[in-house]
Curated annotation (Swiss-Prot):
Listed EC numbers: 7.3.2.7
Gene3D superfamilies assigned: 2.60.40.790, P-loop containing nucleotide triphosphate hydrolases
Domain of life: Bacteria
Family: Belongs to the arsA ATPase family.
Pfam family, one: ArsA_HSP20
Main enzyme class: translocase
Keywords: Arsenical resistance, ATP-binding, Nucleotide-binding, Translocase
Key word Translocase present: yes
Gene: arsA1
GO MF annotation, one: ATP hydrolysis activity
Residues the record lists as binding ATP: 8-15
Protein's name according to its UniProt entry: Putative arsenical pump-driving ATPase 1
Length: 396
């Protein structure tokens, strides 16, 4: 099974591109399910699914054609279903503090619950093996990053905290429970967490396997969107998830300027050209697909088919377009070292230019942009060297 995740800032066109990718694959005979994890669902809108049919689905898959299903996950319903006792305990805890019942119900959905619940579907569909391709339309970038980090966080909690917390509560419940009216988690709460974790087991290996999972970053040729895409790229690399393509959406076609002779559009086109060039430079060697701004909104199968053709041409959308990790950050002898893939680079002078949040590396004709995590932004590049097919930068 192939799993393709689409991530990006809100409004860049993730949902439409997810829908177009899924539809194209279904036309190629692949069994596909496209799942929207974005709370502001618009996946069914892309396929022009009637409102009544969406309501009937109640968060379950909707069949589009023989090979394609779509699903808009109802997070509230899923959390109540899968978290069970955990959700009810947190709701009770908030209610005990004096919060209104409705507000307590809303606040009982803690940060991370939505992402972990969504991961259940990744594991479920992968294990069942009823589809050739699973496409995930992720929430905006921040939540996407949390989504890929959650398996690691959950594993750490279960290994380091869970058993101790369970034991403490078992000992404390009989005595502390008589001294306070604040509810304490009972054994059912811990059993629910344990069962939940069992359902999630193995999903982290699925997400970091480049032969199975790819993330495609959807961006627009604008400064703020580009910056967010760069940060997302860095974090996906740090979590070991393969980014196999960047899709630059809503690029103004040059022929429109020639036909309309509009100075307003021409100015925007020149701005976009600048950022497209930056995107190609920054994300290299990850392939960048440029998608023109269309003259009408992309709704319905015919327009989705047209969009997919503009993105992928004759390439199958489930192809792994790139698998090499461009760079990684590790510790060596107490220092942080940035390893950059640079096949064919010879041992010659290395130029390093450090900006506020990145390092630009030049060696001959080779150029790479390395986004720095917060921990490294106050450090300076001490030295650099070429070792086999890598450039090593030592930070201090």
């Amino acid at each position: 099974m192939r799993i393709i995740l689409f991530s990006g800032k809100g409004g860049v066109g993730k949902t439409t591109i997810s829908a177009a990718t899924g539809y194209k694959l279904s036309q190629l005979g692949k069994k596909v399910i496209v799942v929207s994890l974005d709370p502001a669902h618009s996946l069914a809108d892309s396929f022009d699914v009637p409102e009544e049919e969406r309501r009937k689905a109640k968060g379950l898959p909707i069949k589009i054609n023989e090979n394609l299903e779509i699903q808009e996950i109802d997070i509230q319903e899923e959390i109540e279903r899968y978290w069970g006792e955990v959700y009810r305990f947190i709701e009770l805890l908030f209610h005990t503090t004096g919060l209104h019942e409705i507000l307590a119900d809303e606040l009982a959905i803690l940060p991370g619950m939505e992402e972990i619940t969504s991961l259940l579907y990744v594991n479920k569909y992968y294990r069942e093996g009823n589809h050739d391709v699973l496409i995930l339309d992720l929430p905006p970038t921040g939540e996407s990053i949390r989504f890929v980090s959650m398996p690691t966080v959950m594993k750490w909690y279960m290994k380091k905290i869970f058993k101790t917390e369970r034991l403490i509560m078992k000992v404390a419940r009989p005595t502390v429970g008589r001294m306070t009216d604040v509810p304490l988690p009972d054994e059912e709460y811990f059993k629910a967490l344990e069962t939940f974790y069992e359902r999630l087991k193995g999903v982290d290996e699925i997400l970091i396997n480049p032969d199975i999972t790819s993330i495609r970053i959807v961006s627009n040729p604008e400064k703020m969107v580009l910056k967010e895409s760069q940060r997302a790229f860095l974090y996906f690399l740090l979590f070991g998830v393969n980014v196999d393509a960047v899709i630059v959406n809503k690029v103004i076609p040059e022929e429109v300027i020639q036909q309309e002779n509009c100075s307003f559009l021409e100015k925007w086109l020149n701005i976009q050209k600048k950022y497209v060039k930056e995107i190609e430079s920054y994300f290299s060697p990850v392939p960048v697909f440029k998608v023109p701004l269309l003259e009408e909104e992309v709704v319905g199968l015919e327009r989705l088919e047209k969009l997919a053709q503009l993105i992928y041409g004759d390439e199958p959308p489930d192809k792994i377009f790139h698998k090499e990790i461009p760079y990684k950050i590790e510790q060596l002898d107490g220092k942080y070292v940035i390893r950059i893939k640079a096949p064919g680079v010879k041992k010659e002078s290395i130029s390093l230019v450090k900006g506020e949040d990145e390092i630009v590396v030049r060696v001959g004709n080779f150029k790479a942009h390395v986004m720095l995590p917060r921990k490294l932004r106050n450090l300076e590049p001490e030295r650099a060297k070429v070792e086999k097919d890598e450039i090593l930068i030592f930070m201090s």
